[in-house]
Regions:
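Short acidic alpha-helical/loop segments enriched in Asp/Glu that coordinate divalent cations
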Residues: 100-101, 117
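Alpha-helical repeat scaffolds
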Residues: 102-105, 137-139
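Short alpha-helical hairpin
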Residues: 28-33, 59-65
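Core helices of alpha-solenoid repeat scaffolds
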Residues: 65-66, 99, 134-135, 164, ...
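Structural detector for internal amphipathic alpha-helices that build alpha-solenoid repeat scaffolds
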Residues: 6, 10, 17-26, 39-61, ...
Length: 224
């Protein structure tokens, strides 16, 4: 009940902020796109969404919304609109349409030098969707030195042999080291202990905890 109340309060505040932005011309072209998207969703799917906050707070259950929303995402000038739509509407486990679109859009953002702004939202989305057919593409993403930590951990859970050398290299990158340690633990491979165990004595608490957890996962497997 408390969570519902808090959500209702936040929703009301965000509606008021949206009304203010619309009245003062903030992100005016993007709100025109929002209105067009809401109208198309209503016309095609009978979805009664009347504001951007409806799209942010309420997930459309019908997967037929994905091709409609996909047409709009690349068109927003303020990328924040696109990322909110992805977070609320594209976290659909195993959905190939979501996965295929996000792959295309990621490559487009990368080509335009805008990927860093979308990285966190995309990282979470790929982990939620869990499309194993995209392993080669996902490995390409973690080849960037400090990018897509949750995707890297997911590749570890999948025990991706192709990703393993990249993950080991990431142990040298401070900003992503903890995720690399976590990912290695997911392989549950005794031969990886020499890469993990040195971090048990790290001066950084996050690295120590990740290493201890990873070693425990691997050693428990060995005992069994």
């Amino acid at each position: 009940m408390a969570d519902n109340y808090a959500t209702a309060v936040l929703y009301k505040a965000d509606i008021e902020r949206e009304l203010y932005n619309r009245a003062t011309g903030v992100d005016a072209e993007d709100y025109i796109l929002v209105d067009s998207l809401c109208a198309e969703l209503s016309r095609c799917l009978g979805v009664d969404y009347r504001s951007f906050q409806d799209l942010r707070y309420k997930t459309i259950k019908n997967d037929a919304c994905i091709p409609i929303i996909s047409k709009y995402i690349p068109r927003f000038a303020n990328i924040g609109f696109a990322l909110e739509l992805i977070t609320q509407q594209f976290w659909r486990k195993g959905n190939k349409e979501c996965s295929n679109f996000l792959e295309r859009w990621t490559l487009e953002l990368k080509a335009n030098g805008r990927l860093s702004k979308a990285e966190n939202a995309l990282d979470n989305a790929f982990v939620k969707i869990q499309d194993k057919s995209k392993q080669d593409f996902l490995i390409g993403l973690i080849c960037e030195k400090d990018a897509f930590p949750f995707t890297m951990e997911m590749l570890g859970r999948w025990k991706s042999e192709a990703a393993l050398p990249v993950i080991i290299e990431r142990l040298e990158v401070d900003t992503i080291k903890t995720s690399a340690i976590t990912a290695l633990g997911k392989y549950k491979d005794i031969s990886l202990l020499p890469y993990i165990e040195p971090f048990i004595n790290s001066t950084k608490a996050g690295e120590r905890k990740a290493a201890a957890r990873a070693v425990k996962q691997i050693k428990n497997l060995r005992i069994q």
